[in-house]
Amino acid sequence: VETLKKINGGGEHGPHDVILTPDKKNLYVVAGNHTQLPAKLDAKRNPSAFEEDLLLPRQPDARGHARTIRAPGGWVCKVSPDGKKWELISSGYRNAYGLALNGHDELFTFDADMEWDYGTPWYRPTRVNHVVSGSEYGWRTGTGKWPSHYPDSLPPAIDIGPGCPTGAEFGTGANFPRRYRDALYILDWTFGTIYAIHLTPDGASYTGTRETF
């Protein structure tokens, strides 16, 4: 085994899934919000404004969770196979775990909620996000999370609710009826559930409905 790149982060909110890009020439890497980006990025699609420009004062988490974590939070990078070139393509996740490509080579992920925030105005459910170039999904520590209606923050394709995301995979190539071959399958550890997410084009992105599979 050869170490290609040491990443500062680990554990439940560390680096997670690694998959091939559609052209099979590079890798996509997703990491949780306790994982620092490499000190030197070769490219960054996200504007620098997508950092700590909060309009309202922020209240840190009362139990101390992620108090020192700042933008970009969780992230997705495109990486060369030798680990030398890193390009940030999307950020603002809490703890997205799996990555999956649909039949059109579009990238999706399943992001985690902060369960301690449940019932507060700033609670954000687990959700499926369409990982587009330069996208920002607005995770910030404490009460500073960007609502989905902020112009700079993309909305999810679908909110799932409380849970704990693990894997994600499309049914492409499976011996299923067409509807299920096109579905995104997301795994929730908390409730031991696999959901089939049926995505419908909506403008430049998608909206989804869920079905317990």
Protein language model annotation of sequence segments:
Residues 1-213:
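Beta-propeller domains with acidic blade repeats across secreted/periplasmic ectodomains
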